[in-house]
Amino acid sequence: MMEGLSPASSLPLLLLLLSPAPEAALPLPSSTSCCTQLYRQPLPSRLLRRIVHMELQEADGDCHLQAVVLHLARRSVCVHPQNRSLARWLERQGKRLQGTVPSLNLVLQKKMYSHPQQQN
């Protein structure tokens, strides 16, 4: 993990975090392996269509936040595990694939619904 950022390297990251586009908002930095912030807003369908694969980041050991990491072609986006738009998308994917949903999707859905907090 990175120990710290210089002010010059923090500015581009800050600008990305303030960007309204979710795919640019919280990219997973290539030099780290853990999400440090989570995207909590509804996910646009154009972003969901571009998912190459997903993984679940557990809040244990090296990483301090539980997150769903959406890997796109050129970047990764860290999403809150209870994001409602992600849950709806996973549900639609499950219906579309009719029982062939990868086990990760089932694990994600189980974890999302095991903590009944209000989330987008």
From Swiss-Prot:
Annotated Gene Ontology cellular component terms: extracellular region; extracellular space; nucleus
Keywords assigned by UniProt, alphabetized: Cytokine, Disulfide bond, Nucleus, Secreted, Signal
Annotated signal sequence range: 1-25
UniProt feature coiled coil, ranges: none
GO molecular function, one term: cytokine activity
InterPro entries assigned to the protein according to its UniProt record, in alphabetical order: Chemokine_IL8-like_dom, Interleukin_8-like_sf
Expressing tissues: Isoform 1 is predominantly expressed in placenta and weakly in skin. Isoform 2 is predominantly expressed in testes and brain, weakly in kidney and liver and even lower in heart and muscle. Low expression of both isoforms in other tissues.
Pfam families: IL8
Biological-process GO terms, alphabetical: immune response; mononuclear cell migration; positive regulation of mononuclear cell migration; positive regulation of T cell chemotaxis; regulation of actin cytoskeleton organization
Entry keyword Transmembrane: no
Disulphide linkage map: 34-63, 35-78
Assembly and interaction partners: Monomer, dimer, and tetramer. Heparin avidly promotes oligomerization. Interacts with TNFAIP6 (via Link domain).
UniProt family annotation: Belongs to the intercrine beta (chemokine CC) family.
Protein's job: Chemotactic factor that attracts skin-associated memory T-lymphocytes. May play a role in mediating homing of lymphocytes to cutaneous sites. May play a role in cell migration during embryogenesis. Nuclear forms may facilitate cellular migration by inducing cytoskeletal relaxation. Binds to CCR10.
The protein's name: C-C motif chemokine 27
Species this chain originates from: Mus musculus
